[in-house]
Amino acid sequence: MCIRTASQLAQLASLMLVLSCLGCEKESQAIVSIALHPTNANILYVATNDAVYKSRDEGQLWERFPSFSARRVTTLAIDPQFPATIYAGTMADAVYKNPDGGQHWLPHNVGLKEHVSFINQFVFHPTHSEQIYAATTVGAFYTKDGGREWEERMAGMKEVHIVVSIAIHPRDPRVLYAGTTGGIYRSDSAGMAWKKINNGLIPEQELMGGMALGVNAIAFDVVNPDIVYAGTTKGLFRTTTRGEQWERIGQSLPDLFVSGILLDPIQPETLYIGGPGGVWKSPDSGQTWTASNRGLASLNIRALAMSPRDSHILYAGTNGSGLYRSTDSSATWTPLPLKAAPDQTQ
């Protein structure tokens, strides 16, 4: 059993932040998270290492929210049913919620442990967006009321791991996958109990090293959600058996570290991944890959996002050269400097 103290977990979280920010030049040039409005393609939010920004014109001009100047935001998420509501996870202050498009932020941390400070990801229930799961440095948490109260959902995770990513089954919301620094877990009971599903990943004795395998991203196949992709620090993996057995794919990729995965809902066999080696695209469910980095000044990709309205439009956040946009399925990229809008009224 690999039980860690809060101090050790904080050290691991700090190490993760350092590793993820290798190559950063300026704070505002490191894009930590990208959140796209579910119905209005003009609106998007990004978090950098020093601020949160909002654009109302597809990234041409930006409003900076000063309320986060003293906090480092680690992830952003827009409520898919009430998109004026935004959640921000921070490095040192847990969860903040905003009800008005980014203007006013309030802490929503009741029920979170005192040492839960680093939030990695939020995931919404597919039909009840007030139900949210949070991946944190000390495990998985759940709220049924939009963040008013949180409860731990860690039963079955025998080792205390940093939970880096969570994915919820699009058709059966009782089924969850959690990516941790010790591999992958699945829950068939909305997080009430978890089962380790590491067959085919790196050997168990190596996982006992704690940081031997970080699962940074999990994505479901568009057609068959029993097929799941996992982007890790040791490569890209795929399962066709709900995680009971994993296989390594993308052996031709030049870098093992995968920070993000996107699947095209219109062309289900098309995958995108991002990492320190840039953006790579596969037309055949991960069997073959080509680099898609034309126009990128930095290949260190930290965040990827696909427009929910048009799968040809992609956004890439880099560690070093800011935000980019592609309108041709990643064939070319155009920089989007965080240029201030002349009028920042709501």
Regions found by a protein language model. Give the residues of each.
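Extracellular glycan-interacting surfaces
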Residues: 12-346
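Bacterial N-terminal signal peptides that target proteins for export
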Residues: 2-13
